[in-house]
Curated annotation (Swiss-Prot):
GO biological process: translation
Gene name tied to this protein: rplD
Organism: Caulobacter sp. (strain K31)
Protein name per the record: Large ribosomal subunit protein uL4
A UniProt-annotated Pfam family: Ribosomal_L4
GO cellular component terms given for this protein: ribonucleoprotein complex; ribosome
Membrane spanning stretches: none
């Protein structure tokens, strides 16, 4: 697959070949994408919800009344879950919501996510993502020229500092380095913008995995 390379002013700056094994998958596996997005979001959950168990509730542990002779149940503590102000039975505690997912599934999902963007014509290739000044207004004007309203920009091995500063105040624009490329962020934005360096890095990344 061949795409035109453009610059930030919208002018053509050559062309680039995209690997069909990464960007040309025809049958997109939505089930694999769903599994990986769920895995990513589960890892992000803080898991800090917490209730007080019986030994943490600030209530008396003294026996409420004598064991026999009252006709009532044999309660022994106000901390029991059935009483107002008592503990919560089987409530949430601090834990990790993360779970394991095979690396091959994660790699497959990334290929399918990239292919879905290519299939819908939602990939733009930039020559570079570098600015001389961190001016948000200037970058927004450039994005308007190339029709970017909602996009993920993969800017190369490192994100240019001026580009990062200029882009962070623009709504619905995310900027990540090559290492930050992930399924969730690819899918949540309408357009995927790759620099030429990013395209080469993606191809090299999957070539290394296949060699391994």
């Amino acid at each position: 697959m061949k795409l035109d390379v453009i610059n930030l002013d919208g002018g053509k700056a050559g062309s680039v070949d995209l690997d069909d094994a990464i960007f040309g998958i025809a049958d997109i596996r939505g089930d694999i994408l769903q599994r990986v997005v769920t895995w990513q979001l589960a890892k992000r959950r803080s898991g800090n919800h917490k209730i007080q168990v019986r030994n943490e509730v600030s209530r008396t542990g003294k026996k409420m009344y004598k064991q026999k002779g009252t006709g009532s149940a044999r309660h022994g503590s106000r901390r029991a879950a059935q009483f107002v102000g008592g503990a919560k039975a089987h409530g949430p505690v601090v834990r990790s919501h993360a779970f394991d997912l095979p690396k091959k599934i994660r790699a497959m999902a990334l290929r399918h996510a990239l292919s879905s963007k290519a299939k819908s014509g939602s990939i733009i290739v930039l020559d570079t993502a570098v600015l001389t000044d961190p001016k948000t207004a200037a970058l927004r004007a450039n994005f308007d020229k190339i029709g970017l309203k909602n996009a993920l920009v993969i800017a190369g091995p490192e994100v240019d500092g001026n580009f990062k500063l200029a882009a962070r105040n623009i709504p619905n624009i995310d900027v990540l380095p090559n290492a930050g490329l992930n399924v969730y962020d690819v899918l949540r934005r309408h357009t995927l913008v790759l620099t030429k360096d990013a395209v080469e890095a993606i191809s090299a990344r999957f070539a290394e995995k296949e060699a391994a």
